Amino acid sequence: MAVITILEFPSVTRELYEQVGAALSGAPDGILYHACGPIPDGWRILGIWESQEAFDAFTDGVYIPAMQAQGGALPARRDVTPAHHAGPVLRG
């Protein structure tokens, strides 16, 4: 089942986010949609994933270690919500 995810990292800037992204090797398995942007005192990452298992495997095994290697903190917020709908919006 698809899931909607939110990660919020305190004190992360656009520059740090881009450094972490540059250290990764392409899109992770299982991601369907990604969006991110600044929030007060940090950075928010939203995603839609094929499953919570895919999200957890990437986040815990790849992304958080990469963030910490660049001097970033652990996420202050980590939410996973089952998606009722995950797909394009049809305009009609």
Residue ranges of predicted features:
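Short S/T/G/P-rich N-terminal loop/turn motif that feeds into the first structured element of a domain
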Residues: 1-46, 50-65, 72-92
